[in-house]
């Protein structure tokens, strides 16, 4: 089973009235003010999966600052996932500072949400260190068995729109504070795997994964072997970051990486299947 653990879809209204959404959210404006920045629907994702030979995809929300935009987006994610016959796995978006967040989480979980993401604490205006928002997110992970996906930012290298998301020090602190919560550090965790060499970090990272989303835009292909050496293939998830990167392109790039058969199977889908408690086949 091949599972893309990191894709994004939006309701059709977002593309149809993009200017209105650009005015309502600073981070959306940063990422999508360029008309060439693609906004994809569920139908486009499913067509891409068919073309690439991908069985299932995690369909992520966007880190809106406005809780009402989160709700609007999540309704679409959950409705389209339900219609997909299990091919789309919904990760809802959340503004944890909103007073109705706990009620929203209960409702979304009942409708089939499997995780929260891609969360962007910096642009959404909260910290993961000693904060009510961190406590709420850990509670959501425990209470509803939700996987938390964070947009983790590498602290060095070139700048690009939307880079700010979550500094690696905050991600590391959240993991050590709440080691029982399942976490995905997107984009190779912003360098998090290196810190698995610290014994107390390694001890806390048993339920922590990193994904390969947008690898070709950030790292050389050697990142796969280096991260496997640091945390093991069992903690790496294949992710494309569709539609920013095409799924066929991302999968072909992964298959160009020399991996043993077991590591390839884990990264291409077995890790995600186990993490998300999906049935075989």
Question: Can you describe what each PLM-predicted range is?
Answer:
Residues 55-56, 64-156, 218:
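Active-site gating/metal-coordination segments in enzymes
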Residues 7-9, 61, 92-96, 117-121, ...:
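A cross-domain feature marking catalytic cores of carbohydrate-active enzymes
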Residues 40-46, 73-78, 101-103, 167-171, ...:
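Alpha-helical scaffolding within the catalytic cores
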Residues 1-8, 12-56, 226, 230-237, ...:
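Mid-to-C-terminal alpha-helical segments outside catalytic/metal-binding sites
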Residues 44, 76-79, 107, 135, ...:
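Alpha-helical elements of Rossmann-like donor-binding domains used by nucleotide-donor carbohydrate transfer enzymes
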Residues 14-19, 71-72, 103-104, 160-163, ...:
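Short aromatic-enriched loop/helix-cap "lid" or pocket-rim segments at secondary-structure transitions
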Residues 114-115, 127-237:
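Catalytic pocket-lining loop regions of alpha/beta-barrel enzymes
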């Amino acid at each position: 089973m091949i599972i893309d653990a990191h894709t994004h879809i939006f309701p059709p209204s977002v593309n149809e009235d993009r200017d209105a959404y650009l005015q309502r959210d600073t981070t959306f404006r940063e990422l999508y003010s360029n008309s060439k920045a693609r906004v994809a629907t569920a139908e486009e994702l499913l067509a891409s999966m068919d073309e690439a030979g991908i069985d299932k995809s995690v369909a992520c929300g966007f880190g809106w600052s406005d809780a009402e935009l989160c709700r609007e987006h999540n309704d679409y994610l959950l409705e389209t996932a339900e219609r997909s016959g299990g091919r789309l796995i919904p990760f809802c978006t959340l503004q944890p500072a909103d007073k109705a967040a706990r009620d929203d989480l209960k409702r979304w979980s009942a409708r089939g949400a499997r995780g929260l993401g891609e969360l962007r604490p910096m642009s959404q205006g909260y910290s993961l260190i000693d904060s009510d928002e961190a406590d709420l997110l850990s509670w959501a992970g425990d209470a509803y068995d939700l996987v938390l996906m964070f947009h983790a930012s590498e602290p060095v290298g070139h700048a690009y729109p939307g880079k700010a998301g979550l500094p690696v020090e905050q991600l590391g602190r959240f993991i050590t504070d709440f080691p029982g919560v399942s976490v995905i550090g997107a984009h190779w965790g912003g360098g998090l795997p290196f810190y698995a060499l610290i014994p107390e970090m390694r001890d806390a990272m048993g339920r922590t994964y990193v994904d390969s989303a947008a690898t070709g835009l950030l790292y050389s292909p050697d990142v796969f072997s280096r991260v496997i050496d640091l945390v093991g293939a069992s903690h790496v998830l294949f992710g494309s970051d569709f539609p920013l990167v095409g799924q066929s392109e991302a999968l072909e790039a992964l298959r160009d990486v020399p991996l043993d058969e077991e590591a390839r199977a884990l990264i291409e889908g077995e890790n995600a299947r186990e993490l998300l408690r999906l049935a075989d086949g």
